[in-house]
From Swiss-Prot:
Source organism phylogeny: Bacteria, Pseudomonadati, Pseudomonadota, Gammaproteobacteria, Thiotrichales
Organism: Francisella tularensis subsp. tularensis (strain WY96-3418)
One cellular component (GO) term of this entry: cytosol
Family matches, as InterPro entries: EF-G-like_DII, EFG_III/V, G_TR_CS, P-loop_NTPase, PrfC, RF3_C, RF3_dom_3_sf, RF3_GTP-bd
Function: Increases the formation of ribosomal termination complexes and stimulates activities of RF-1 and RF-2. It binds guanine nucleotides and has strong preference for UGA stop codons. It may interact directly with the ribosome. The stimulation of RF-1 and RF-2 is significantly reduced by GTP and GDP, but not by GMP.
Localization per record: Cytoplasm
Cross-referenced SUPFAM superfamilies: EF-G C-terminal domain-like (SSF54980), P-loop containing nucleoside triphosphate hydrolases (SSF52540), Translation proteins (SSF50447)
Official protein name in the record: Peptide chain release factor 3
GO molecular function: GTP binding; GTPase activity; guanosine tetraphosphate binding; translation release factor activity, codon nonspecific; translation release factor activity, codon specific
Gene behind this protein: prfC
Length: 525
């Protein structure tokens, strides 16, 4: 295999999906520890610790606004190059979070075993479903009193509609947690407390029968019964089903104590796919093609008001990035030179001179790059599957100075091109309705309108709870629909027809009465 093909085969690009507080920050930190990107755990602070972190990963770099390193972490593990993309939790949750999942080849789902499957996890899994993304699952927090593990598997299968294949099985829980049993290698790994900040060689015992004394007779007998049940009731791991997104291997442990994380990472790097081919409008692009192609899935604004610079996150789909190379911007038809792309290496932030399929690079963007833009080395090619997602929170924008309406419209449309919010212009009023997935986005927009466009605005409630894009192949039926439902219709910032529903029932009735109209929760960029 050539050096070029080896580099591609090494890459594993993924994101972690979880509900806030399920342990994403902790598990990220342990992965960085195993990847030698940090020396001891406990250096990554989550928001509630009071550190000003722009994501959960690094302290804010006040000198240059947002720390770009927080959004992508690259580190080596087991002969692989891991690209871990951040999916923010809590109040900075936005459409970006959803769209990041379109740039990965697999995902790690972290479930809080005390609480089970939660709301945010369901939403993120629905996005993974759009591309049948392979999912690995880590059941976290077994050093606490958790739900019954069989019950947890049942819940994942019923709510998330994915088969579970347990790879290991917990021995006890909470203060009686003794370790995990590897179902495929007949090996017990014994748990000890107090090693969360380091890589610790937990004791292993080959053969379940040989671990009887170490775990105690009562737990041993319970475990034997559980294993019989599990083997009878759950699914065997099947690599093909995993790669098709139909089955998830499940690992148990506690990220805080750094127990079970290594086993999960070993399985992840073994089974998760290398960079996959990508669908474009003209053809399918293979990861091992020689020419550089890729797309922008996220734009991050600089928080430093003196610099209107933005960073466009570019997922390489094929070819090799080299410093100083020229690329073709498909939407504008112009050539663009990449002189100083940012590359992301956890721990060391040196400018790496090259990147391969699966890698993410940051392009400096002064307003010319939009989410969903494709770049090639000359071929006219647009990648598909980088969607806009229907917002979930809506507010009416109130302008403090009516003479600034033009500046407000320009600002809202430009900011919506960055993908954090969406703007809607209703048919029957001069209102501007702003929609977002996360509540923080409204504050960010108001702040940036004031500082970058010199427009002051506030918000008020609006009778909208759901938005759906409208598509129809029959022009007459579409025109009839527009006349009948004009009170609910609007155009989004890019000019697409949208239905703004006051209630879920209203939307359902409109869909039932108009079977030829497509009401879509996503639209392509």
């Amino acid at each position: 295999m050539s050096e070029y093909l080896q580099q591609i085969a090494k890459r594993r690009t993924f994101a972690i999906i979880s509900h806030p507080d399920a342990g994403k920050t902790t598990i990220t930190e342990k992965m960085l520890l195993f990847g030698n990107a940090i020396k001891t755990a406990g250096t990554v602070k989550a928001k509630k610790s009071g550190i000003h972190a722009t994501s959960d990963w690094m302290e804010m770099e006040k000198q240059r606004g947002i720390s770009i390193t927080t959004s992508v972490m690259q580190f080596p593990y087991n002969g692989r190059i891991i690209n871990l993309l951040d999916t923010p939790g809590h109040e900075d949750f936005s459409e970006d979070t959803y769209r990041t999942l379109t740039a990965v080849d697999s995902a790690l789902m972290v479930v809080d075993a005390v609480k089970g499957v939660e709301d945010r996890t369901i939403k993120l899994m629905n996005v993974c479903r759009l591309r049948d993304t392979p999912i690995v699952t880590f059941m976290n927090k077994f050093d606490r009193d958790t739900r019954d593990p069989l019950e947890l598997l049942d819940e994942v299968e019923n709510i998330l509609k994915i088969k579970c294949a347990p790879m290991n099985w917990p021995i006890g829980m909470g203060k009686y947690f003794k370790g995990v049993y590897d179902l495929y290698n007949d090996e017990v790994t014994l748990f000890e407390t107090g090693h969360g900040h380091e890589i610790y060689p937990y004791k292993k015992i080959k053969g379940l029968a040989n671990a009887k004394d170490a775990i105690g007779i009562d737990l041993y007998e319970d475990l034997e019964m559980e294993i019989d049940l599990v083997r009878g009731a759950s699914h065997e791991f099947d690599e093909q089903e995993f790669l098709e997104g139909n089955l998830t291997p499940v690992y148990f442990g506690t990220a805080l104590s750094n127990f079970g994380v290594k086993e999960m990472m070993d399985g992840f790097t073994r089974y998760a796919p290398a960079p996959q081919h990508r669908e474009a409008d003209q053809r399918v692009v293979a990861a091992d093609e020689q020419k550089l192609t890729g797309f922008v899935f996220k734009i991050q604004a600089n928080m430093d008001e003196k610099h209107r610079n933005r960073i466009a996150f570019f997922r390489i789909c094929s070819g090799k990035y080299e410093k100083g190379m020229k690329i073709f911007h498909e939407r504008t038809g112009k050539q663009m030179q990449i002189s100083k792309a940012l590359t992301f290496m956890a721990g060391e932030r040196e400018q790496v001179e090259e990147g391969y399929a699966g890698d993410i690079i940051g392009l400096h963007n002064h307003g010319s790059i939009q989410i969903g833009d494709s770049f090639t080395q000359g071929e006219k090619l647009k990648f598909k599957g980088i969607p806009n997602f229907a917002p979930e929170i809506f507010k009416r924008v109130k302008l403090n100075d009516p003479l600034k309406m033009k500046a407000l419209q320009k600002g809202l449309v430009q900011l919506s091109e960055e993908g954090a919010t969406q703007v809607f212009k209703p048919f029957i009023s001069n209102d501007l309705v702003l929609g977002a997935v996360g509540v923080l986005q409204f504050d960010v927009v108001a702040q940036r309108l004031a500082s970058e466009y010199n427009v002051k605005c506030s918000y008020e409630g609006v009778n909208v709870t759901l938005a759906r894009w409208i598509f129809c192949n029959d022009e007459k039926k579409l025109n009839d629909f527009k006349k009948k439902y004009e009170v609910n219709l609007a155009y989004d910032g890019a000019g697409y027809l949208t239905y703004l529903a006051p209630t879920g029932v209203n939307l359902q009735l409109a869909q039932e009465k108009n079977p030829d109209i497509i009401f879509s929760a996503t639209r392509e960029h």
